[in-house]
Amino acid sequence: MKKLVTCKEMKDLDSTTIREIGVPSEVLMERAALKVVEETEKYLQKDERILVVCGSGNNGGDGIAVARLFHLKGIRVEFYMVGNKDKMTRETALQYKIASGYRVPEVNNPQWSEYTTIVDAVFGVGLTRPIEGHYADIIHEMNSARAKKIAVDIPSGVNGDTGLEMGIAFSADLTVTFAYRKRGLCFYPGRLYAGRIVTADIGIYEQEAVTASAACLENKDLQLFPERDPDGNKGTFGKVLFVTGSEGMCGAAYLSASAALRAGAGMVKIQTVEANRIPLQILLPEAMVCSRFDQESNEQLLSWCDVIVIGPGLGTSVASREREQWFLTAAAREKKPLILDADGLNLLAAHPQWYQYLGEHVVLTPHIGEMSRLSGRTIQEIQHEIADTALKCAAETGSVCVLKDACTVIADEKGQMYLNLSGNSGMATAGSGDVLSGILAAVLCMYLKTEEQPPMVLKAALGVYLHGLCGDLAAAEKGMRSMLAGDIIEYLPKALAIGEEESGL
């Protein structure tokens, strides 16, 4: 698990290292430059000619130091000061003086076509306004050059918190970011502008008490999944109830239930309309199918299950509305874990009085369109503030919010947040969300290997990460263009095996 920081959090960490620990800012700048040179050298070939483009802030100071280090290695390098020299920070002015002493070549009118590598050190995480005018022209020239492109800490023009483009942004092949990955390097388009991202240790003081605004999971976090109990039975590995599948929509029920079983749930029951019974029993004989919706049957299903999933293929008819309301109310009464997805969310948006049944036992899994219906905000507003939207939804409902997008945000009412970096565009296909709801249900049934009972938000984040990992494995063999939702399920065994390898099993 890796911490992800906002611009303010990174500034505070810098300040703590410099003022409280006593590490001079010049030392941090030198270490940053060394890391950029170290990573850039991996891409260099013979007869390289490097241009480092520098602003007047500390990002520019990093860049001048990079130019000096390349110069001392005998590599052809020049630096170009696009920032106002009269407004250089103290550290950058010192780097400029040192570079002058070492006679590092400086250019005032670079011929962009002559360079094989361009290093962007114009703006860092401190950028607060759109880039325009002279600076925009320079970044346009940098992007147009046929050269390898390296960004120092963050591509100029990328918002360090949201990943949004601030007027124009540098398009890098490699970004060497310092100490922690910035949140803006997780969200698109910032993640796209960054290219390959390397997080470099430059000596920023790290203490356990440092609270970051978000975190992201890695393959090694799958070791939190428990070993399969050798004397367990199908009942002890989790029982999931799916309230789903209107007529003609048994595919959603099948995908969701199948994913739950493949992800490790011991038993599955699907409550659906009678017309779906035979198709489901043929497609998934391991599942039990119930087509009764009366009080007695509902009570039996509620008593039987450990987790409820409402929504995939449910429809929005009067009968579907009544089924959802019954199970929402009952789950709230018994605090039974419940996942609300697809039409379950659409019905919730149409009946805001049901919000009273939500709480910490609920996981909401909206995509951007469903969140727009739930929140009343436009899709563009949500895309521009996706993290804040997820946090607000979680706070207002008391539930875990899994806001699905290219970078899915998982948040709870306490402000704990995960950004998911697994997955790919091949997963943007019909049924992928149904598969996710099934995987989440299976994970909610598990007792993770943690010292304390883990919060629901961590289980949800693990489920989302596992879903994305399956998609990455599928894309590697099938290609993103050809992927189907069922391919994600197909690769669950391989993805779970990676978790077992991380656990040393």
Where are the predicted features?
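Internal gly/pro-rich beta-alpha loop/helix module
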Residues: 116-117, 122-213
